[in-house]
């Protein structure tokens, strides 16, 4: 082995693998491969330590250590990572859906991977593969998205644009407490219950056709012998390969079936014709099926060992499949539990909303009943009361500070009379509000609940001079105006009075704000722009007696 290659390889191993035991295992596997020269076993053993996407570059680093004759087989057995992104477009409204299942997300500590494809479905038809990592959806990177956020992003458009790169691994996490693990696509049992055997052990590799190119110029011959197969297995097979020969160099082995040479089909040729074709040219393009007739040239001991080996492999594969299916079963149970939990949460929320609606209806009914009772009890008495007894003066609202803030009794002008007080109230009830405002565009019917909701635009001239009280955490349960001071922008506007509920400030709903949060939002809005928009629920007009003091 070239020292520079070995040094670079060790450096990459140290960089990608921190665990010393795993490093030792990797070097032991490579030493055993150079003794047995079994590529399939090597790749199967490597997959046990190259078990996450960040370690996949090790396959490329190991490739220079593989003899030339085994590199084609090595490339076939190792996952083919794609560095380039592939973009496809899927119709979200297709009757059969997108045709894929995905795993992963930010909450699992990994990206989003395709774990299952419906055969001949949309995703399968456009060339997506199990083990593809989804990088972008509709132009947005999903590297910091949870699983649910990605699903919601897919639902935003009719045509879904997906960019993927092939990794060849799938994330597996059976429970929240279990660390994240990865499985190769050929080892993964999909949600449909099917699975494919791993290519990582001998005997599991399917017979695959491959081509070799041989130039006989300057050589003594191929260095192999051929023979015809029996009646039950016709064809031309390689019966012997001379060590160190040209055939051995290109990877031909005993038991390989020759299916074509220089475009001539060997399936119906007899032994003599096959020999003539092989000797007819100094440049040969040979198509073979590796190992197709290996059992024809095995000894009894080799056959017995092969049977034992296959049985061990079968048991191992069955165990892997059972483990994979059990993992999927646990995942499906967890998904069902999560769906049930969300369903219960939604049901409780609906029940809570219904209970709140009934309570509010009951409160409204009780308030209406109380109002009617009050009118019945006091309305008739007011009609019988002599006008001469109403000799009290009107107590006006303090012009600069509310009564409880001044700490002194307000002064009354003896010239004020009952009619003057009535005019004062009439001016106060005048509201300047924006017409055409639809409160249902901002609030739910439960939030409005019969209120007279208006949009006011207050020009910023001087100070607002508006005091608030209450808040969602107070007995009042809402933010209301406690005072409107004379000379302020609110008083000059004329559309805000004490008792009005503040529902929104500059488009921001404050029905669930505390007093401190509402005051901060009001101050922030007042410091921005030339106007401030306030959405208020108008305080119901007070009874006339509330504005009078009797002596």
Swiss-Prot record:
Function noted in UniProt: Anchoring/scaffolding protein that is a part of the functional network formed by USH1C, USH1G, CDH23 and MYO7A that mediates mechanotransduction in cochlear hair cells. Required for normal development and maintenance of cochlear hair cell bundles. As part of the intermicrovillar adhesion complex/IMAC plays a role in brush border differentiation, controlling microvilli organization and length. Probably plays a central regulatory role in the assembly of the complex, recruiting CDHR2, CDHR5 and MYO7B to the microvilli tips.
Region Disordered, residue ranges: 401-425
UniProt region (Mediates interaction with MYO7B), positions on chain: 194-532
Gene Ontology BP terms: auditory receptor cell morphogenesis; brush border assembly; inner ear receptor cell stereocilium organization; protein localization to microvillus; regulation of microvillus length; retinal cone cell development; sensory perception of sound
Broad class of the protein's primary localization: cytoplasm
Domain of life, per lineage: Eukaryota
Localization of this protein: Cytoplasm, Cytosol; Cytoplasm, Cytoskeleton; Cell projection, Microvillus
Sequence segments annotated as region (N-terminal domain): 1-86
Gene3D superfamilies linked to this entry: 1.20.1160.20, 2.30.42.10
Bias-annotated ranges (Acidic residues): 408-419
GO cellular component: brush border; cilium; cytoskeleton; cytosol; microvillus; photoreceptor inner segment; plasma membrane; stereocilia ankle link complex
Listed name of the protein: Harmonin
Alphabetical UniProt keywords: Cell projection, Coiled coil, Cytoplasm, Cytoskeleton, Differentiation, Hearing, Phosphoprotein, Repeat
Organism, as annotated: Bos taurus
Sequence ranges assigned to domain PDZ in this UniProt record: 87-169, 211-293, 452-536
Domain comment as written in the entry: The PDZ 1 domain mediates interaction with ANKS4B, USHBP1, USH1G, SLC4A7.
Entry's transmembrane regions: none
Coiled coil: 318-377
Modification type Phosphoserine: residues: 219
Gene giving rise to this polypeptide: USH1C
CDD domains (UniProt xref): harmonin_N, PDZ1_harmonin, PDZ2_harmonin, PDZ3_harmonin
Quaternary organization: Part of the IMAC/intermicrovillar adhesion complex/intermicrovillar tip-link complex composed of ANKS4B, MYO7B, USH1C, CDHR2 and CDHR5. Part of a complex composed of USH1C, USH1G and MYO7A. Interacts with F-actin. Interacts with USH2A. Interacts with SLC4A7. Interacts (via PDZ1 domain) with the C-terminus of USHBP1. Interacts (via N-terminus and PDZ 2 domain) with CDH23. Interacts with USH1G. Interacts with MYO7B. Interacts with CDHR2 and CDHR5; may mediate their interaction with MYO7B at the microvilli tip. Interacts (via PDZ 1 domain) with ANKS4B. Interacts (via PDZ 1 domain) with DOCK4.
């Amino acid at each position: 082995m070239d020292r520079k290659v070995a040094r670079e390889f060790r450096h990459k191993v140290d960089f990608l693998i921190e665990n010393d035991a795993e490093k030792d295992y990797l070097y032991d596997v490579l030493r055993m491969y150079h003794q047995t020269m079994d590529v399939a076993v090597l790749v199967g053993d490597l997959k046990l330590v190259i078990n996450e996407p960040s370690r996949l570059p090790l396959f490329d680093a190991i490739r220079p250590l593989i003899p030339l004759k085994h590199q084609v087989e090595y490339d076939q057995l190792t996952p083919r990572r794609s560095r380039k992104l592939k973009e496809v477009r899927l119709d979200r409204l297709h009757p059969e859906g997108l045709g894929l299942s995905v795993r992963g997300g930010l909450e699992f500590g990994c990206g989003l991977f395709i774990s299952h494809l419906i055969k001949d479905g949309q995703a399968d038809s456009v060339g997506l593969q199990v083990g593809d990592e989804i990088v972008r959806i509709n132009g947005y990177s999903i590297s910091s998205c949870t699983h649910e956020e990605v699903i919601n992003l897919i639902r935003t458009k009719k045509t879904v644009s997906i960019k993927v790169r092939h990794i060849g691994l799938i994330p597996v996490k059976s429970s929240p407490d279990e660390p994240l693990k990865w499985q190769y696509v050929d080892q993964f049992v999909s949600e449909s219950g099917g699975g494919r055997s791993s290519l990582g052990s001998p005997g599991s590799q399917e017979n695959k056709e491959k081509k070799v190119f041989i130039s006989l110029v300057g050589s003594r011959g191929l260095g192999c012998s051929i023979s015809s197969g029996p009646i039950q297995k016709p064809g031309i097979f390689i019966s012997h390969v001379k060590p160190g020969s040209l055939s051995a160099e290109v990877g031909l082995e005993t038991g390989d079936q020759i299916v074509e040479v220089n475009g001539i089909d060997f399936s119906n040729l007899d032994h003599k014709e096959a020999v003539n074709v092989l000797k007819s040219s100094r440049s040969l393009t040979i198509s073979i099926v590796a190992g197709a007739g290996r059992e024809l040239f095995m000894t009894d001991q080799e056959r017995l060992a092969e049977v034992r080996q296959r049985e061990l492999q079968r048991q191992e594969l069955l165990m892997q499949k059972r483990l994979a299916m059990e993992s999927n079963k646990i995942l499906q149970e967890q998904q069902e539990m999560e769906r049930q939990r969300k369903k219960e949460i939604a049901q409780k929320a609906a029940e809570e909303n219904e209970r709140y609606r009934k309570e509010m209806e009951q409160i409204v009914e009780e308030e209406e009943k109380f109002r009617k009772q009050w009118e019945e009890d006091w309305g008739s008495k007011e009609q019988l009361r002599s006008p001469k007894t109403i000799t009290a003066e009107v107590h006006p609202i303090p012009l600069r500070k509310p009564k409880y803030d001044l700490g002194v009794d307000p002064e009354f002008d003896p010239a004020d009379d009952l009619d003057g007080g009535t005019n004062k109230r009439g001016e106060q009830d005048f509201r300047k509000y924006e017409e055409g405002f639809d409160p249902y565009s901002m609030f739910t019917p439960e939030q409005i609940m019969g209120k007279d909701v208006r949009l006011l635009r207050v020009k910023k001239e001087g100070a607002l001079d508006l005091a608030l009280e209450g808040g969602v955490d107070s007995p009042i349960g809402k933010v209301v105006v406690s005072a409107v001071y004379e000379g302020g922008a609110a008083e000059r506007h004329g559309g805000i009075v004490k008792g009005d509920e503040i529902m929104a400030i500059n488009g921001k709903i404050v029905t669930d704000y505390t007093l401190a949060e509402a005051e901060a939002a009001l101050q922030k809005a007042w410091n921005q722009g030339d106007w401030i928009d306030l959405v208020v629920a108008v305080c119901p007009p007070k009874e006339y007696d509330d504005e009078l003091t009797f002596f």
